[in-house]
């Protein structure tokens, strides 16, 4: 009878409780709900095609500098000549990495626009009814969108502004090419408008007010290249907003702690990509740089790829007393018994019947060696702690902006305003970073030494190309393997001029948008 009564009651009172409908009243009322809404826009930075991708944004910022070279070892890493072309600045407008960099940046802007469109669908189009939380969410999405535009600006210069939110029909969106200065002004205006609405709390991995300060400082640091006029005072002011903002950012007492597998919420990191070896993949730096024999040394489940390394000239910028030198592996690779591992290259014509002792050397003798005799050449990068037992992806978060960079940025601004030499305040800022590395404090400092210090501190973190351009050292490319091609033929030095400071608009972008884009000069 009880069961029958329940059935009868259910049939006469058909008012089901709804759990899944999203309305303006029941959604977007907590930070957690908005985090779910915007998660996909942040997720653009993870994965194999994300920010640290070996064939995209990161490679464009690093492979093209003195920090990274990828020698072809036998047949490994030739990749149709792309790594060599990137290193030697002989890329063209359909080079793989250049195509991928564009897709990454504008894939990010599109996802941010989707977030903003969803907010309008949930909250309605009457903005007068939006509450503080809604405006904070909009500001976060727009700041992230400005970040992706900044990446595109830095790489390609004269690009498009992707801010279409209201228009649902993508075919009706008018694509237009803007000048570098116009893109710069768009990003600046977006950030200045968003900053008052952003949360002023420290939320690890999110676009908050201090992160926007860091992005704006980066924009102003490179303003002369982007817009034709330096903005050193503005850059310094926004660095101060972080330094004096009470956010709790400090230098970690141990440099290598910043990059450990447990670096989440490290007080030095201002804005990271939050990686996870299982659920948020994408940090593969240990995998691409370590030699195959390092699999057993680090207990990795798959062999590393024996690819990117640094140049001897860059490695030699580190004093032996510099604790940051520990981010590079040079020397014998030892087995569990303390003996040097012997590696069989498979090429009987080299070494001892094809076998070479596993001794990593700083010097890279050839950028292309079909014999594989260069198998152990080039210092390997272990800043991001290789974790025992992992496979392809690491758990270490990747810092895009960190406190040490902010200190060095402000010091640079002060030096630029002081004829290129450090005053007392600039010295004090740089020495915070320099002495943390176990070195004696500077008593004087010029811009060339500051550039070297930035390199030592920020190696492989995606800043080197930008820095070399700002210091006038990029186009001239005076590092190893820049004077001869892979076959030993001399490269015409007249090819290297300022046009390489920006990459070409990818061929596929121009083909898909006929009549819209004018190719960047020199391509």
Where are these regions (language model features)?
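Sec-dependent bacterial lipoprotein signal peptides
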Residues: 1-9
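An aromatic- and glycine-enriched ligand-binding surface/loop that stacks and positions planar moieties
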Residues: 12-80, 159, 163, 184, ...
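Short coil/turn connectors between adjacent alpha-helices in alpha-solenoid helical repeat scaffolds
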Residues: 101-104, 175-182, 224-234, 421
């Amino acid at each position: 009878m009880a069961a029958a009564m329940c059935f009868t009651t259910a049939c006469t009172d058909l008012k089901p409780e709804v759990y899944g409908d999203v309305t303006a009243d029941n959604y977007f009322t907590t930070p957690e709900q908005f985090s779910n809404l915007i998660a996909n826009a942040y997720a653009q930075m993870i994965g194999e095609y994300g920010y640290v991708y070996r064939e995209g944004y990161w490679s464009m910022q690093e492979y093209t500098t003195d920090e990274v070279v990828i020698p072809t070892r036998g047949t490994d890493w030739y990749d149709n000549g792309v790594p060599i072309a990137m290193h030697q600045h002989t890329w063209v407008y359909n080079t793989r990495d250049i195509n991928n960099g564009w897709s990454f940046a504008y894939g990010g802007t599109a996802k941010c626009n989707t977030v903003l469109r969803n907010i309008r669908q949930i909250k309605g189009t009457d903005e007068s009814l939006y509450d503080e939380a809604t405006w904070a969410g909009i500001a976060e999405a727009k700041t992230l969108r400005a970040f992706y535009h900044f990446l595109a600006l830095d790489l390609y210069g004269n690009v498009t502004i992707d801010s279409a939110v209201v228009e649902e029909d993508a075919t009706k969106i008018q694509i237009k090419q803007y000048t570098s200065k116009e893109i710069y002004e768009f990003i600046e205006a977006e950030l200045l408008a968003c900053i008052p609405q952003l949360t002023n709390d420290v939320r690890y991995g999110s676009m908050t007010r201090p992160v926007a300060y860091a992005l704006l400082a980066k924009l102003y640091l490179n303003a002369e290249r982007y817009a034709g006029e330096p903005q050193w005072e503005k850059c310094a002011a926004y660095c101060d907003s972080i330094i004096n903002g009470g956010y709790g950012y400090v230098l970690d007492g141990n440099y290598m702690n910043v990059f450990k597998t447990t670096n989440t919420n490290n007080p030095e990191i201002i804005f990271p990509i939050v990686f996870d070896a299982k659920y948020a993949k994408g940090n593969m730096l240990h995998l691409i740089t370590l030699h195959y024999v390092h699999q057993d040394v680090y207990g990795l489940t798959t062999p590393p790829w024996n690819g990117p390394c640094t140049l001897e000239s860059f490695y030699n910028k580190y004093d032996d007393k510099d604790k940051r030198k520990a981010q590079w592996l040079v020397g014998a690779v030892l087995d569990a018994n303390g003996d040097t591992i012997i590696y069989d290259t498979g090429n009987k014509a080299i070494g001892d019947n094809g076998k070479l002792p596993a001794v990593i050397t700083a010097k890279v003798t050839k950028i292309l060696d079909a014999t594989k005799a260069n198998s152990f050449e080039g210092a390997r990068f272990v800043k991001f702690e290789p974790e025992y037992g992992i496979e392809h992806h690491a758990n270490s978060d990747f810092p895009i902006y960190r406190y040490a960079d902010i200190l060095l940025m402000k010091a640079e601004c002060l030096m630029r305003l002081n004829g290129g030499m450090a005053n007392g305040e600039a010295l004090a800022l740089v020495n915070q970073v320099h002495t943390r590395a176990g070195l004696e404090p500077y008593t004087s400092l010029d811009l060339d030494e500051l550039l070297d210090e930035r390199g030592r501190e920020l190696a492989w973190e995606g800043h080197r190309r930008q820095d070399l351009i700002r210091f006038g050292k990029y186009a001239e490319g005076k590092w190893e393997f820049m004077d001869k091609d892979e076959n030993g033929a001399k490269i015409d030095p007249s090819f290297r001029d300022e046009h390489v400071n920006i990459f070409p608009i990818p061929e596929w972008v121009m083909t898909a948008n006929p009549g819209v884009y004018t190719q960047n000069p020199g391509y």
